[in-house]
Amino acid sequence: MRKKTKNTNNTYTKKISFVPVILMLAVVPLILRWHVTQLDGPIARFWIGTYETNLYTYAKSIVIIILTIIMATFSFLTIKKETIKKDKTLKLVLIGSCVFIGFSIFSTILSDHKDIAIWGAPERREGLVLHLCYILMFLYTYLVYQDKEDFRYIKYPLIFLSVVMGLIGLSQILGKDILNMDFMNDIMMPNEYKDVFTPQNTGGSVYLTLMHSNYVGSYASIIMSFFAVLTLSNHESTPMRIIYGAIFVFTGIILINANSQAGIVGVGVSMLALFIIYSKKIFKSKKLVTALLLFVLATVSITNIVTKGLLLDNTIDIFVDAKKVLVKDPNHKYDPTYGLPVYDVKASKSLATIYTKDGELNIYFKNATDLQFTDSNKKPVEAIYNKDQKNYKFAPPFQKLMLLESSESSQEFSQIAVYYEDFTYYIIEYTKEEGAYLIDSQGYRYENMIAPHMGFESSERAGSMRGYIWSRTLPLIAKNPI
């Protein structure tokens, strides 16, 4: 009797240990809650405004931290040391995890901005704390899910998540976003902020509950890979395999409508891996090969029709980007302007020079409000000043350029915004004591410089500008490897 009671208690304990993972898989991705954070320090220096409004990530990160603490507590109370000692694979995983954690902590200690390093920047919130959570979540899941029967506690939460995300995605594709409905306003918005909620018009693009379509790509590639394996598994019943296949196809439609090239590449690579793994079984039967080819062709054709050609367009774009990355254009010449109509401003003392695709415009400050204009050849440029609107407009070739004075301008101080076709590019500030210099939208002085870059020549726009990001990130890593 005691043995039965003990086994029953162990069963309950084991089932309870699955709960944090189930919540992490089925609930956390769906969490949306409006949160306002007042910014200070270096974050306020580079952020637009002194407040961050966050709907997608702040609440998720808080729940992740709470669930990770629960996981750590369960691990301490229930997992035996003998289990860890006997598992050779786990030992290797622990070594790798400790190396990652060690470098992360060391990097945080060396950081000049420890608050950002620890808690992360606005919107993402992925600093040291969340990275530690990710590692602990991974280790906990590995330790808790030991038997084949335990797999259902991963499978069913992901089915639930996929269905809910699928409904949200469908509503966004149809332009009837569920997240814009009144009942969602009640869930997402605290009482004091309910009046500031405005429905989002995404134009039919898909972002689910993940803030951006690129994150939809990451989500979809994981879900599709997972359910593709289950669809091909002989250990699952036929009705369930049909459900898995339906989730795979429907998630694929959402992925295509999200226009995430990274997600499509991820799915493509995982499907290639699956093909290699199952190739022996597939090629044993000609009927199976024929059936598989027909299934793939039908799925691709239907998906392309449903998405109105987006699948084909995205696939072509991926190959074009891949060619740019793998094959350097021999005719490519580095252009620091990147085709911007206004690409630089140099300011010092009584002179500011605006560099545009139409030529160079020099501004001479006699004082803060008495300006004279010349071109690169020092020839005068005709300018018309509107006293009511406090702006300067110019004769050709600078007719698309406009300078707008701030309402606080005087003979000793002025701020001038540089517009090109109604878009602001730079702000010039002038004081009697210091002359002319550039300021950002927060009012901080800076000098406009070309960022050092490394690699990705002619392919900087590949993968949603990831080529540009990496080409500017690599020099930073080389300078600060830890």
Across the structure, where does each feature detected by a protein language model lie?
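Membrane-interface coil-to-helix junctions
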Residues: 34, 42-61, 95, 132, ...
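Transmembrane alpha-helical insertion/packing segments
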Residues: 26, 39-47, 90-119
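TM-adjacent membrane-interface loops and short helices in multi-pass inner/ER membrane proteins
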Residues: 212, 341-391, 395-397, 405-412, ...
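Alpha-helical transmembrane segments of multi-pass inner-membrane proteins
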Residues: 2-32, 60-76, 96-111, 128-140, ...
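Membrane-interfacial, low-structure loops and terminal tails that flank and connect transmembrane helices
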Residues: 1-11, 81-90
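Juxtamembrane membrane-water interface segments that cap and precede transmembrane helices
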Residues: 38-57, 111-117, 192-209, 468
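Non-cytosolic membrane-interface motifs at loop->transmembrane helix junctions
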Residues: 117-128
